């Protein structure tokens, strides 16, 4: 689903509420399943700034914690190669492998690579990466998590042509729900099958949502037809109001003349 509307219509605010980053002014939100929310300017918690980029991606499925535990056991085993330490490390590694942990790590790296993040950059701590790289790392984490529903606000920002092509293919094949805000017309035409138009004339007014089925191009055609119909209706109403006002003015003038004649 593509979310469209003029600037200030409330698209980003709607996403914040749906994603749990903000509370609605009134009413309540009922969410089914889990949501993966990518804001325009994602904020990564300060406690994670020293972690590597790949660890942050893996945190989408909590795999980073398991890898950290295995790494600690490995260091412990190398420092003291007792039978107990070797057994602990082997057990943790076997459990991780049985749960598909290593395959999942390979999947996470493939997603990151698809978004244009090179392996050497993934090994660096988050705080040394550029803003564009950090946003791609966060997008990779959200895609890797495999949430029931994705909320993506301008997901193609900071992506080159190859990364955009990869993302489009990923979203086409995504099995969960997808809501997206984007100015990328190719994304809107290729990845969505419905459009929700946020119709909010003024920033302090209550808006409404109009649904259109089809791609963004089909929405544009249908929306133009709706606006033409509404403009024609408004013109007819204005014409009728003017006609009625003329009638009122005419009879008002006659009534005034009659009253003056009667007083004389």
Features from the language model and the residues they span:
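Generic structural signal for alpha-helix termini and adjacent loop/cap motifs
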Residues: 41, 251-254
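Short histidine/acidic/glycine/proline-rich micro-motifs that form metal-
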Residues: 98, 254-256
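A short, terminal or domain-edge coil/loop segment
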Residues: 134-135, 259-263
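Residue-level detector of intrinsically disordered/flexible regions characterized by low predicted structural confidence
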Residues: 8-9, 256-259
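ABC ATP-binding cassette signature C-motif
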Residues: 1-235
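Intracellular alpha-helical coupling/juxtamembrane segments of multi-pass membrane proteins
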Residues: 223-251, 261
